[in-house]
Each structure stands twice: as structure tokens, then as C-alpha cells.
Amino acid sequence: MATNFLVHEKIWFDKFKYDDAERKFYEQMNGPVAGSSRQENGASVILRDIARARENIQKSLAGSAGPGASSGPSGDHSELVTRIASLEVENQSLRGVVQDLQQAVSKLEARLSALEKSSPAHRATTPQTQHVSPMRQVEPPSRKAATATEDDEDDDIDLFGSDEEEDKEAARLREERLRQYAEKKAKKPALVAKSSILLDVKPWDDETDMAQLEACVRSVQLDGLVWGSSKLVPVGYGIRKLQIQCVVECRWGRPLERSHQVEEHVQSVDIAAFNKI
């Protein structure tokens, strides 16, 4: 009962909360104003810098136009005159250098012509060296006489004499060597060239039995003929041709043209490829 009277008392216990909220509100309201003031201060600094730069530009323009502006076109004319004078001086110096070079070249040409004229006379005045042959040993007369007699004795001998016994022996040796050569050549096997041929065997029509056709082709047996692999290649309209490989010795022509066993099945035989082995 002692605390019930406080219910009827009108006291604001949460006033500090509202005070804090009001303070924060006014702080937020005043915040942008301070930022804008700082922005205005920065803008004023930039404007001052721009004004200072303009003043410097105007001063520099005034300084460059001060002494030169009074001269005007006469200053430019004087500068051109000085440049032309310097170019003329340089031209004169270059002409002098060119003249010196021309004189040096003319002197060199004169010297070369003089050397060319004097070169034959110089060659004529040079002493000619005599060619001295090497010394030869002189043999004594006794040795010369001995060699002369020996040469006469050698001349008496007939190296190409026709002795019957020597002729028979030479003929026998020649015949023996020819016989040995013939035997050696006969023992050596003769090399026979071989060729690899790819044949195109075409049937009469699409009803031809290709297996029987291939059997007929392989039935052809000749010396030096070896049949290889084969395959069927379509030609058109249901007709197929037989491609067969064979190795033959180069002693006869087409093997199938000589055979009459395959005429019932084979229309034609063509050589598709030919290679030497």
C-alpha cells in the first residue's frame, strides 16, 4: 500500500532517452553543414590557385612581349640577315674545301700517270738474272766406254723373237685362262630382273562369280610368276573388278593374255601399276 501512491504521480522517468535522441538529431542536422563549409573552403583554395596561375601567365607574357614588342618586324629581319650571313660564310668555307679536294685529286692523277709512264723504263733498267743450270757430274771416259759396249751387247738380244716353243707355251696359257674364265662365268648365277605388277581383271557382267574368276586367274602357272594378294573393287551398276598383285620375271609379257582358261569369266586384263624390283 505504501508504493501505490506512485501510480498517480506524474513523473517522466525516461526523459534522458528523449534528451539523447534530440541531441543526436541536431548533431545529424548540423553535420552536412560542417561538410559543406569544408567543401567551400577547398573550393576557395582551388580558386585562389587558379587566380595565382593566371597572374603568373600574364606576367610571363608581359615579360616576353616587353623588349621584343618594341622592335616588331625589324627584329625578325635582323635575325634573318644574320642567318643568311652565317650561311654565306659556311658556303664559302665549303667551296674552299671542295677546291682543295679537287687539287688533291688532280695531283694524285698526275702522280699515277707519271708512275705508269716510268714503269716500263724501270723494268728495262732492272738487271736480268741469269738462269744457272745445276751442276752435272762428268763421268770418266773409261766408264762411258764400258756403258757403250754394254749397250751394244743389249742391242744384239732380240726381245721379241719368234721362238716356236715360247709361242706354244703362250698359246697354252691363254687357252687355260680362257677356259677358267668360262667355267667361272658359267658357275655365276645370272641375274634376272623382276617386276611387281598390279592387274585389273574385269568380268563380263554382274552375274559372274568373282570367287571362281579369282580361282581361274590363280590357276595360271608360269615360270617366274608368283601371285600375291587380291581384292574386289566396285566399278558401277553392281559390277566389281578383281585387283590382284603378282611378281614376274621380265622375260615375257602379260600372263593372262596367253591363257585361254579364263576367257569364259574374264572380259579384259589391264595393268594398273608396274614397278621394278
UniProtKB/Swiss-Prot annotation:
Modified residues (Phosphothreonine): T129, T147
Residue(s) carrying Phosphoserine: S37, S44, S60, S86, S106, S119, S133, S162
A Pfam family hit: EF-1_beta_acid
UniProt xrefs under InterPro entries: eEF-1beta-like_sf, EF-1_beta_acid_region_euk, EF1B_bsu/dsu, EF1B_bsu/dsu_GNE, Transl_elong_EF1B/ribsomal_bS6, Transl_elong_EF1B_B/D_CS
Positions of modified residues (N6-acetyllysine): K17, K107, K117
Assembly description: EF-1 is composed of 4 subunits: alpha, beta, delta, and gamma.
UniProt name for this protein: Elongation factor 1-delta
Source organism per UniProt: Ovis aries (Sheep)
